[in-house]
Amino acid sequence: MDKYIGKRLDGRYLVDELVGIGGMANVYKATDVSNGRIVAVKILRDEYVQNGELLRRFKNESKAVALLSHPNIVRVYDVNFSDRVNYIVMEYIDGITLKEYIEHKGVLDWKEAVYFTIQILRALQHAHDNGIVHRDIKPQNIMLLKDGSIKVTDFGIARFARSGMHTMTDKAIGSVHYISPEQAKGDVTDNRADLYSV
């Protein structure tokens, strides 16, 4: 049994069920008992709490998404960083990933592909206008809602384009099938890397 299910985080978020397992965090469906809203809580796994780089990425995600307000980007409601537990409270998305949709349906027809792409590009335009480069655009990080709209998620390796972080990383960051050549080489990236990934 998962140690968070059935527990309240900070007396406010009642964790109901595990809904996703990511590279560094697990995502739970929960209830905000202060207002009854269903939320998603992304909790950094215990084995990564002492990993400075992953903790920095996790905090970076909350900062990046908190700056954004767009219908095609998942919203952040609350964050908590402590010695005990680190989590991000986000909008709960009742849907599937674009990857799951494509695996189920097969090849998308051109109208559907254009419809999804326009929504992704609108989300990225908003992020770029706010100085944020996602750097990990892939079907697994795009949620498809029942009404056909999409939400871009997982800003865990996002970079603030205006933050002065214009140095080479010497390591590739992103998902190998979708990253731009400059990302693959560990070079500095900008918003064009996101467009390449789309």
Please place each PLM-identified region on the residue numbering:
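Activation segment signature within eukaryotic-like protein kinase domains
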Residues: F116-T117
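Conserved short submotifs of the Hanks-type protein kinase catalytic core
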Residues: D83-T97, Y101
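Protein kinase catalytic-loop region centered on the HRD/HxD motif
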Residues: I120-I132
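Conserved N-lobe loop of protein kinases adjacent to the ATP-binding glycine-rich P-loop
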Residues: T31-I38
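Activation-segment/catalytic-loop signature of the eukaryotic protein kinase fold
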Residues: V79
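AlphaC helix of the eukaryotic protein kinase fold
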Residues: R45-L67
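Protein kinase glycine-rich loop
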Residues: V15-G22, V27
